């Protein structure tokens, strides 16, 4: 049944260095098969993220100055400018987007995938922008910076007056309007500061890393589900993965927990991502004995499908050989070494258009011997199911990964947050008399498809849509079936694994390993005990010899200490004992992928 549902939905939705400071001067875009209009669509399309009211974000000052938070502070934190867009009047950074509640018309600031998956590098005096590459930004610095600025705005009368003047405009002198704004700000801070407090870890993530699983889990399983005790410190940050080729990989996430073989699975991955960056979701019920009346989300699933389809066309970046040539003799020798020692895990994908699925290799932690914290955090431990107990056969506690996966699946099929349906989609889907065109249309509208898109889909896919809807009904009926007794093996040791994916474009994605603990490809080929134990992250100056970014301290960089929990740079060093010459040969070949 699930296979048919997935298949049907697939048919449905078919000189070597730069400073850590913001890049100035002309930026060149590497050839990755995206024309300028497609690139701007990726940079500016909302996926339903809603951090705070849009007018607040535009008006917000840095906590200790009168400078603009988004114009002045975000570039300091590594977020890239987007001044070329015609669909971005306020010149928001790449991946920061305006979202609108289609029912109330309220506007919000949000983020899309481009904010964390676009980077710039400098090589031989030129600056290149790489789409789909891991950003060198400081997301935790951004979140805490917002907290500091909001608190300063609430507490400093002059700062609040300037804030109110920008937000309220002509109403800024209206005492009642200012009082209402102050109350709204205070109430927002109760939620926001609690979120920051619960998410604060002893050792901040630093540049180029995010604990994506931890943030998504806390947002969905603690805040949205309304169970504070489910919250767990997001203390296993990982390197931001690159996006080219992702659509064709059988599994995604560093620990491979997200299946990715069809468009509904890809949509689930993207819905989980936007829930982690502040999409709204409602999972709570009025009673622990019933399914929530409205399980709704602001995730704009149609837009997410659009963005995913753009990523399918994104090519990996080619090494800029016109600036630094690849040594062909070393490359040939390195290719032979790669075929002997590496290709069994890291398949080779030709540069250019990709249409062929790739079965990624999942490697046991006992074999690769890299830091276990991310895999352990995502796998070990249980969480409360709360109002959704019936979705888990009556179990009050389930493994953390299972809870998150189910909540994301529920969000995928939930009504669109800004639509006010007459009854819950979950109620309707458990009835047997609702396979008409109108009902299917309503479902498609509720998950974010436009009227025009729904009409076009029905013109060609009427029977397939009905089949998908029937499959979906069967799935939901299984969700709301009778509770069954079940136990949780809390102490059962899971088999921890990490993903080994193709390495196309790997040269543009430092630092390396899943936790970003190795600064260059050259060091990745060293034994673990010979790698750098402390280095700085955030510089965009590129070392074309070792293939990585400059690691000296500079303004805006953050220290990476491999002795801290979750930061080990050990492992991935048992696949061949290379001498120095062989290391450089492999580096030269890796540049060419």
Please report, for each region that a protein language model flagged, where it lies by residue.
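Bacterial N-terminal signal peptides
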Residues: 8-17
């Amino acid at each position: 049944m699930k296979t048919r549902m997935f298949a049907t939905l697939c048919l449905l939705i078919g000189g070597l260095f730069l400073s850590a400071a913001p890049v100035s001067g002309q930026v060149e875009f590497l050839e990755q098969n995206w024309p300028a209009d497609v690139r701007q669509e990726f940079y500016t399309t909302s996926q339903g993220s809603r951090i705070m009211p849009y007018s607040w974000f535009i008006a917000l000052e840095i906590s200790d100055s009168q400078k603009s938070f988004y114009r002045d502070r975000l570039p300091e934190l590594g977020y890239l400018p987007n001044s070329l867009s015609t669909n971005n009047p306020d010149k928001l950074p790449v991946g920061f987007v305006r979202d609108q509640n289609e029912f109330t018309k309220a506007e919000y600031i949000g983020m899309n995938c481009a904010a964390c998956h676009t980077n710039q590098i400098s090589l031989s005096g030129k600056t290149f922008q790489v789409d789909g590459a891991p950003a060198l930004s400081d997301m935790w610095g951004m979140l805490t910076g917002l907290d500091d600025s909001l608190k300063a705005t609430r507490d400093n009368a002059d700062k609040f007056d300037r804030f109110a003047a920008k937000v309220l405009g002509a109403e800024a002198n209206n005492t009642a309007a200012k009082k209402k704004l102050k109350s709204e700000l205070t109430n927002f801070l109760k939620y926001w500061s609690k979120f920051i407090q619960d998410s604060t870890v002893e050792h901040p993530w630093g540049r180029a890393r995010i604990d994506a699983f931890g943030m998504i889990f806390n947002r969905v399983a603690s805040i949205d589900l309304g169970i504070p005790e489910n919250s767990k410190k997001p203390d296993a940050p990982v390197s931001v993965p690159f996006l080219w080729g992702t659509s064709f990989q059988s599994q995604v996430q560093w620990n491979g927990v997200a299946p990715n073989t069809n468009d509904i699975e890809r949509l689930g991955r993207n819905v989980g991502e936007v829930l982690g960056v502040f999409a709204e979701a409602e999972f709570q019920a009025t009673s622990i004995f019933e399914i929530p009346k409205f399980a709704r989300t602001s995730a704009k699933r149609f837009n997410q499908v659009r963005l995913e389809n753009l990523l399918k066309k994104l090519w990996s970046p080619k090494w800029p050989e016109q600036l630094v040539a690849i040594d062909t003799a070393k490359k040939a020798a390195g290719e032979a070494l790669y075929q002997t020692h590496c290709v069994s895990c890291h398949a080779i994908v030709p540069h250019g258009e990709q249409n062929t699925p790739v079965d990624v290799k999942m490697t046991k932690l006992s074999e690769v011997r890299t830091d276990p914290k991310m895999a352990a955090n995502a796998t070990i431990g249980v969480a409360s199911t709360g109002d959704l107990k019936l979705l888990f056969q009556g179990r009050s506690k389930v493994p953390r990964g299972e809870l998150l996966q189910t909540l994301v699946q529920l969000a995928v099929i939930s009504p669109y947050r800004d639509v006010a349906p007459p009854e819950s989609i979950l109620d309707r889907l458990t009835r047997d008399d609702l396979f008409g065109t109108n009902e299917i249309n309503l479902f498609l509208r509720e998950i974010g498809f436009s009227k025009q898109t729904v009409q076009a889909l029905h013109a060609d896919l009427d029977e397939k849509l009905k089949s998908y809807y029937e499959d979906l009904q069967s799935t939901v009926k299984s969700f709301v079936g009778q509770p069954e007794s079940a136990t949780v093996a809390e102490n059962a040791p899971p088999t921890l694994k990490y993903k080994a994916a193709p390495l196309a474009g790997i040269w543009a994605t430092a630092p390396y390993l899943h936790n970003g603990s190795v600064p260059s490809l050259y060091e990745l080929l060293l034994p673990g005990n010979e790698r750098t134990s402390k280095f700085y992250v955030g510089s965009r100056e590129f070392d074309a010899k070792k293939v990585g970014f400059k690691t000296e301290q500079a303004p805006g960089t953050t220290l990476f200490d491999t002795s801290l929990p979750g930061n080990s740079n050990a492992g991935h060093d048992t696949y061949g004992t290379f001498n120095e010459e062989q290391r450089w040969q492999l580096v030269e070949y890796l540049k060419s992928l």
